[in-house]
């Protein structure tokens, strides 16, 4: 099996970002045709778990206040950071300075107001309302 995998990687290449193959199909990894095959639910859950773990690790290492939050508030902040991006591409979560400052003071009402007073909240609508309610109340919405 290792020989086959090595041969396939040599022939197909290993591409970490999506690209269009020689016939125009969106492809990723080692010849995975995203247009026709996509990914399985298990693969999506694997990617989600990895991405959430990276997001939580980043939040813990970047914001000392994050670990002081209740689990519900940590989940809300993680959801928001996951959506906005933290380090790759054009991340927006680091730009929410007033929101971060309110959380660092455990001023959850102000954090809610500052989170909702944003372009992001307008873009995601109900998601922002739900997350900011969780942050203010410490309870799942």
Give the residues covered by each predicted segment.
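Long, amphipathic alpha-helical surface segments
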Residues: 2-17, 23, 32-37, 43-50, ...
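Active-site nucleophile-His-acid catalytic modules used for acyl/amide transfer and hydrolysis
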Residues: 54-93
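A structure-centric signal for secondary-structure junctions around beta-strands
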Residues: 22-25, 74
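Helix-turn-helix-type domain boundary/helix-start signal
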Residues: 37-38, 67
